[in-house]
Amino acid sequence: MKSHAFDYQRPRDVEESLRFLSNENSKPLAGGQSLGPMLNLRIVQPALLVDLRHIEELKAATETKDSVTFGACVTHAAIEDGRVPDPTRGFMREIAANIAYRAVRNRGTIGGSLAHADPAADWPSALSVLGATVLIAGPGGRREVLIDKFLTGLFETALKADEILVAIRVPKLSARARVGYWKFCRKAGEFAQAIGAALDDPDRGFARAVIGATRGAPHLLADAAALFAKPEKQALLRAVDGAGLAADAYNRQLHAVALRRAIEKLAA
């Protein structure tokens, strides 16, 4: 199928993009790796497409002593290749390198993936376990939202209709931090059936775990220290049940194993 006809605008900066997006039935375009197929299948039919890919602010990554801020249009490939700073000592590069295929990574963006909020995508779970902060711009100015408040459900976020995601700020891991991630896919490059992520950062007081690829937003275990110390089957299953996955025995077991393997990688 082909998309229905729409108007197209290429704004020069964030403020101009917000003016265009104030039009009724407009849609922002970042990498287009999710939006493109949705347009072709006519799942979405915007009257106006606003292309954000040429806004310099959204393509930049800035580093401070404590964090790295990634513009929304930083591509997966830029992270994979090390063309932008990695605050996680290689973890984000590994995540990016295992997203879909290189052609997708060349165009797909970290901000587009997060704003799309597909539970089976990698960045929602990975950024949740890292404790990222989402930077948002709208007609009323700019605001910041913690990622666990930003991701609200299945393809749902805290973004208002007239706002855009402009950046993601990721705190730097301390020297003693350990992070683990595991996903199950039917075949390489596909969206995940189950995701487990774990972060143990004692210098910052973090012992977090995330159960991803659920029926909604990633399920955050904000204090997972006891689970890290003793990741027994029943404790893992209870955690998975808390993510609303108790009804399907296969899915429940798959998520429990993904979480266990992510925790095991902390000691690797």
Where are these regions (language model features)?
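C-terminal structural segment of proteins
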Residues: M1-A268
